[in-house]
Amino acid sequence: MNAARMNIKVSTPSRNYFVRIGKGLLQEGGSLARQLKLEKKIALLFDQAVETYATTLIDSLKAHDFEPQALAIPSGEGSKSFKTLETIVTALAEMKLDRKSTIIAVGGGVLGDVAGFAASIFLRGISYVLVPTTLLSMVDSSIGGKTGINLPQGKNLVGSFYQPLEVWIDPEVLATLSPRLISAGMAEIIKYGMISDQKLLDEIEKKEQSDLLYLIKRSVEIKAEVVGEDEREQTGRRAILNFGHTLGHALEAANGYKDLLHGEAVAIGMHASCLLSNRLLSFPDESTQRLKKILQLYSLPLKARGLSKKDVLEALQLDKKRERGTISWILLQKIGLPITSKDITKEDIDWILKEVLA
């Protein structure tokens, strides 16, 4: 296997599958589908913003005698809704798909989440392949089988654990991604460095000189390892992937899923978690400063602007990881050593919101 082609295995109790990484994979979609022995009729869902890439994949599938039927989904977090879910499953029924049929979803995390959820419930479950087109979805949401939609009250409150058949990552699609979206994706890569891998942080700090293919590969490896150990968040191991997400999700909900990108919210959440870790666990000041410098290096925010404390607190109370009225926070004892804490007091939360709400 040469450096341009990497296959990372994800092993879970419900399914083992490969994440395939390589430049030009979109043009090889037909061949990859043939290797998977997919049925001829394929539902190809794509984000309207990446129609060009969807067309490339459709052409490849047709060249290998598949019959892709395309459905465009509007871009944006608003598509993680019951309305979009209904649109998708209705279209699947009209396409006359059966239980051996497959969905291929081309787009970012929003499309992957709602397409995966549709796959999990249509005919009580059909297979799906994810083709992530944003950096964030490549390194995070496409791996691990979390699917779902949002409610007005909070993010990902309706969904399922349902693993894909495969994930195809073609880094060439990132060439058309805006710098802001690249930075948003980098937030999740930074997360992996903070919870697991100092060497990954070293590479991240090189910025323009960093090896993007390596950053993607290493992030996928870390997530695959964690998901393999705790697919359905039963043991607590998978919870470490929520570093920065407890507050991050609350900020997104309080913002109405509008101006703040997921990666930006996670960046603020990681900053907050480091400050709390310093306050409660003596997490080193220099490590907090290191995170701040990395976030600033990628133009990621440290504070949320224009949000009310009341709205953020209400959103925190709807956190889906809440148990018996208690919210779990992922804190760090040191870089690479995360812990789950349920001992965050109201005073701690009041303090941290003063620190990160501008």
From Swiss-Prot:
Gene3D superfamilies the UniProt entry points to: 3.40.50.1970, Dehydroquinate synthase-like - alpha domain
Catalytic reactions on record: 7-phospho-2-dehydro-3-deoxy-D-arabino-heptonate = 3-dehydroquinate + phosphate
Any Pfam family the entry gives: DHQS_C
Residues reported to bind NAD(+): 75-80, 109-113, 133-134, 146, 155
Pathway the protein takes part in: Metabolic intermediate biosynthesis; chorismate biosynthesis; chorismate from D-erythrose 4-phosphate and phosphoenolpyruvate: step 2/7
Binding site for Zn(2+): E188, H245, H262
Cofactor stoichiometry and binding remark: Binds 1 divalent metal cation per subunit. Can use either Co(2+) or Zn(2+).
Class in the EC hierarchy, top level: lyase
GO terms, molecular function: 3-dehydroquinate synthase activity; metal ion binding; nucleotide binding
Cofactor requirement: Co(2+); Zn(2+); NAD(+)
GO process annotations (BP): amino acid biosynthetic process; aromatic amino acid family biosynthetic process; chorismate biosynthetic process
Swiss-Prot/TrEMBL keywords: Amino-acid biosynthesis, Aromatic amino acid biosynthesis, Cobalt, Cytoplasm, Lyase, Metal-binding, NAD, Nucleotide-binding, Zinc
Keyword Phosphoprotein part of the UniProt annotation: no
Subcellular location: Cytoplasm
GO-annotated cellular components: cytoplasm
Entry superkingdom: Bacteria
EC annotation from Swiss-Prot or TrEMBL: 4.2.3.4
PANTHER family attached to this UniProt entry: 3-DEHYDROQUINATE SYNTHASE, 3-DEHYDROQUINATE SYNTHASE, CHLOROPLASTIC
Annotated family: Belongs to the sugar phosphate cyclases superfamily. Dehydroquinate synthase family.
Biological role: Catalyzes the conversion of 3-deoxy-D-arabino-heptulosonate 7-phosphate (DAHP) to dehydroquinate (DHQ).
Protein name, per record: 3-dehydroquinate synthase
